[in-house]
Amino acid sequence: ILLMSACAMIYAQAGSSPYQAIVAVDGSGDYKTVQEAINAVPDGQTKPWLILIKNGLYNEQVIIPKNKPYVHLIGQDKDKTIIHLNLNVGSKLTGKEIGGKTAYWEHSVHNPSSPVYKYEGSVVVVKGDHFYTENISYVNDWGVLSDNGPQALAMNSQADCASFYNCKFRSFQDTWMTANNDVSRHY
């Protein structure tokens, strides 16, 4: 992991880039969203595909599909490179409401009127094996702002050999979920 970061710095100093894609919300990179860069990764990679994510607030859901292994997301600064979204997996309450709490329904993936309707229930979903990330904050705004309510995942990693270095994960409940099987190793 440290070797990869050191190599990236050496390439940057030499004037050539080790990255296959650069994401910048301000438009100064190859892509403005992380998902656009993920979509451009060739299927069936057998070596790391490095994506630099410049500092910024990326308000989006990111899904790394199973057919895109070896995706590496590398941020500039974990406090300034933030992938976030406001969503939860709460279902509509019927009958007596629990403590008057129904505000979550507006941001539920089950609500047909919600902007996140039918989204997968996490800010980031990793299905591609050999995923690596560093220097990025993954934040589910629902959990951070509400501090109560239904499940609000920031990260759902279903892949094998996923590595996380110098990252932040923020939400309220069930912030990070991993696959429930014997072949999903995380580092």
PLM regions with names:
Residues 1-16, 93-107:
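Bacterial Sec-dependent N-terminal signal peptides
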Residues 19-52:
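Acidic Gly/Asp/Thr-rich repetitive segments characteristic of extracellular carbohydrate-active
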Residues 23-27, 50, 69-150:
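Right-handed parallel beta-helix/beta-spiral solenoid domain characteristic of secreted/periplasmic
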Residues 32-43, 58-67, 73, 178-179:
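Short, T/G/N/S-enriched strand-turn elements that build extracellular solenoid repeat scaffolds
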Residues 38-41, 163, 169, 185-187:
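Glycine-rich phosphate/ribose-binding loops and adjacent secondary-structure elements
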Residues 54, 65, 74-76, 127, ...:
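Feature marks extracellular polysaccharide-active and adherence modules
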Residues 56-60, 78-80:
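Short active-site-proximal "capping" loops at secondary-structure junctions
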Residues 62-65, 85, 122-127, 144-146, ...:
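Glycine-rich beta-solenoid repeat tracts in large extracellular/virion proteins
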